[in-house]
Amino acid sequence: QCLVGSEMCIRDRNSKSRKKCEEHPGEVQKRPKSIPADIVRFKNGTEDWIAFVGLQDGRPYEIFTGKIEEDAMYIPPKINKGFIIKVREENGSKRYDFQYIDRYGYTNTIGGISRLFNEEFWNYAKLISGVLRHGMPITNVVSLIESLHLNSETINTWKLGVERALKQYISDGTKTKDKCPSCGQETMAYQNGCLTCMSCGYSKCG
């Protein structure tokens, strides 16, 4: 269920766990040193990519993405949650580490995930994170990303991966103003991260 504006929404994600998220448009919440994060894996062309989605109050607060380099950033495929830790260096610069618990209960830390990612993708991710931190509704963030017209095919493919990652956090039943391409009715709503027509059942994911 979800209310418009500053809201609390609760949805059943993957029919296993319930996710609660609060949206505060225009309000920037202070970032704790460590915040919980989800891992979303996706394809960028033929390459395997990964997204770290940092969460505040259950909603996306920041997102970092890049190509999976197993020799530099191996994370077991079954690991889909962890923590993003903000570390301030002695010289005043900052970095972000990712921390997770392995199957044996040991804490594993990958230091400086920002250095592992292509700078161009990192900068786009920082831009998107800035919008998320200001509490823009996820549907609006997705629409903003969709409206970006980028020259590089690789970046456009990456953009689609980010859209898919964020759509997972849109509450089931959230309506849009889109017309169904199948029946023409304005009855499109999100279900399990996919746009679904409530009239004819047409569905589009990704």
Please annotate each region the language model reported.
Residues 1-5, 10:
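Single conserved hydrophobic/aromatic residue that forms the stacking wall/gate
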Residues 3, 133, 199:
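Short glycine/serine/threonine-biased micro-segments
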Residues 7, 61-62, 139:
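Structural motif
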Residues 11-23, 144-150, 163-164, 179-185, ...:
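A glycine-rich phosphate-binding loop feature that marks nucleotide/adenosyl-phosphate handling sites
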Residues 21-118, 180-206:
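Non-catalytic terminal/interface segments that mediate subunit docking, oligomerization
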Residues 90-171:
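Phosphate-backbone binding interfaces of nucleic-acid-interacting proteins
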Residues 174-175, 192:
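Flanking scaffold residues of small Cys/His-coordinated metal-binding clusters
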